[in-house]
């Protein structure tokens, strides 16, 4: 009889795949999430960029990955640690991306906090160096105007 992998093991496997495919295939993340899943980001304000707003449900999460793929090319995405306590899994790592239009490189530590209910992820909150993102995307003036 096989044992069901822990939420931490499932999250780690999804990120390992994400790194190996260099961000071209987000499907393992969809195996984790429920229909009521919400993805949120520390990036603010929400109208700054598609990646900044909350993404609720599979279709909106697909929009997130499409926006990421449209603008950024993954250089690396390394897992440092995955911690599980109760229904919470925290992924800690680093990533480096090149903006497809500006050519700028953004390297940042990254922390993703996952919340699970009944074996399905219901929420993920991502934290990263937002200034590196804004600089890399050439959006400093837009951010200054929004602030």
Language-model features, listed with the residues they occupy:
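Short, low-complexity N-terminal intrinsically disordered segments enriched in polar/charged residues
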Residues: 1-35, 142-147
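Hydrophobic pocket/interface hotspot
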Residues: 11, 29, 33, 37, ...
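Generic anion/oxyanion-binding catalytic loop in active/binding sites
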Residues: 18, 50, 103
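A solvent-exposed, acidic/Ser-Thr-rich amphipathic alpha-helical stretch
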Residues: 32-87
């Amino acid at each position: 009889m096989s044992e069901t992998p822990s939420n931490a093991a499932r999250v780690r496997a999804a990120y390992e795949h994400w790194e190996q495919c260099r961000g071209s295939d987000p499907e393992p993340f969809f195996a984790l999430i429920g229909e009521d899943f919400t993805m949120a980001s520390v990036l603010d304000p929400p109208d700054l960029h598609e990646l900044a707003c909350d993404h609720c449900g599979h279709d909106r999460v697909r929009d997130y990955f499409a926006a990421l793929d449209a603008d950024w090319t993954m250089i690396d995405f390394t897992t440092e640690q995955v911690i599980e306590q109760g229904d919470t899994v925290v992924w800690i790592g680093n990533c480096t991306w090149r903006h497809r239009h500006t050519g700028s490189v953004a390297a940042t530590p990254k922390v993703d906090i996952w919340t699970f209910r009944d074996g399905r992820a219901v929420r993920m909150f991502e934290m990263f160096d937002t200034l590196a993102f804004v600089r890399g995307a050439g959006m400093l003036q837009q951010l200054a105007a929004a602030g």
